[in-house]
């Protein structure tokens, strides 16, 4: 299915890191998404060093306080994990996509030949990541989240992508209009302002 096909809402089910590093749990989540009618599932490829400094601080969890860096380290999995997930997505009849948070995770994601590359809102101003995504993704659709972003930041991100695409083609770029208020009032969506393919983010 074409992610930009008109007349059909394209449903991406967020798995993120909810698998907890267990392939068996990932299988269950993929199966559940497929059974619910999702077109695609999305994971997060996490490397702690791409996201935060080791001395960022602590987070309070049910088991007590833990270093935030250590928590992100726990979310790291082997490269083979996502190859297996992608293969299982194919078996279940859903597409595979993921969010990278830095250049290492991006390169690994591109090697997986995903259905799409989803850039998370905090990475909207990560211009080196956007530039490499545009240059190396070729025909892979790019979904760009825009939560808590100013219009000038969105324009700069799109300009960075366009400048780094060899063919300057923006037909397979979509903005994920992410109003960071869950759930967001309809009066705050302002969707008519956007003139490229738009997605909405519900939590």
Regions found by a protein language model. Name each.
Residues 1-203:
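Catalytic cores and adjacent flexible loops of soluble metabolic enzymes
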